[in-house]
Curated annotation (Swiss-Prot):
Transmembrane segments: none annotated. One of its GO terms (molecular function) is neuropeptide hormone activity. Signal peptide: none annotated. It comes from Penaeus japonicus (Kuruma prawn). This is Crustacean hyperglycemic hormone 6. One of its GO terms (cellular component) is extracellular region. Hormone found in the sinus gland of isopods and decapods which controls the blood sugar level. Has a secretagogue action over the amylase released from the midgut gland. May act as a stress hormone and may be involved in the control of molting and reproduction. SUPFAM superfamilies: Crustacean CHH/MIH/GIH neurohormone. The keyword Ribosomal protein does not apply. It is found in: Secreted. Keywords: Amidation, Carbohydrate metabolism, Disulfide bond, Glucose metabolism, Hormone, Neuropeptide, Secreted. PANTHER family: ION TRANSPORT PEPTIDE, ISOFORM C.
């Protein structure tokens, strides 16, 4: 897991791994070269991450993932 200097919050390998996995899954679904990179940009605080979240996970988990982004 590569540390992203744009992440100014808590360095938590478990949280970062969870957020990274969502971006990887999103790339695996769409197979667009920039999806994973865009999803991780600005420490996951971006539209691509939100779109991946909405596409891949049930609404009941959206708030939890958004809270995780705020923590890292």
């Amino acid at each position: 897991l590569v540390f992203d200097p744009s992440c100014a919050g808590v360095y938590d390998r478990v949280l970062l791994g969870k957020l990274n996995r969502l971006c990887d899954d999103c790339y695996n679904v769409f197979r667009e070269p920039n999806v994973a990179t865009e999803c991780r940009s600005n420490c996951f605080y971006n539209l691509a991450f939100v779109q991946c979240l909405e596409y891949l996970l049930p609404p009941s988990l959206h708030e939890e993932y958004q809270a995780n982004v705020q923590m890292v």
